[in-house]
């Protein structure tokens, strides 16, 4: 729960940076479902701002070096925890992922590029 709460804080911070501020707020973790909802809401707010014509108040480098890279670290932690719980995240070819602005919720379309193990003699990319 703390990881998800922290990731929500990170995307709130990223939005703040994108808007030309740099407000960091460390929230108190809530119940699991509330944190998941808050995470998706934070991600959606950042996604909408980045997709808009509003000017960026921080460089792309600052956003990636700060909150986004921090969040990627925690995504890796969650993947490790899932694998330890025999519920691994399926692999996919991220270069071919169907990424669309506004599609940031828990419900995602099936990805045709997901796999459990790459075909013998072939690489994932």
Tell me the role of every PLM-derived stretch.
Residues 51-58, 115-125:
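Long, charge-rich low-complexity segments
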Residues 13-54:
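Helix-adjacent hinge/juxtasegments
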């Amino acid at each position: 729960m703390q990881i998800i709460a922290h990731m929500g804080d990170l995307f709130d911070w990223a939005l703040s940076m994108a808007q030309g501020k740099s407000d960091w707020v460390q929230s108190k973790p809530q119940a699991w479902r509330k944190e998941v909802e808050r995470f998706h809401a934070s991600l959606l707010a950042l996604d909408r701002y980045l997709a808009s014509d509003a000017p960026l108040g921080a460089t792309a480098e600052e956003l990636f070096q700060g909150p986004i890279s921090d969040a990627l670290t925690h995504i890796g932690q969650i993947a490790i925890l899932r694998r330890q719980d025999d519920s691994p995240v399926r692999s996919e070819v991220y270069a071919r992922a169907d990424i669309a602005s506004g599609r940031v919720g828990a419900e995602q379309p099936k990805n045709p590029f997901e796999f459990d193990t790459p075909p013998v003699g072939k690489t994932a990319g």
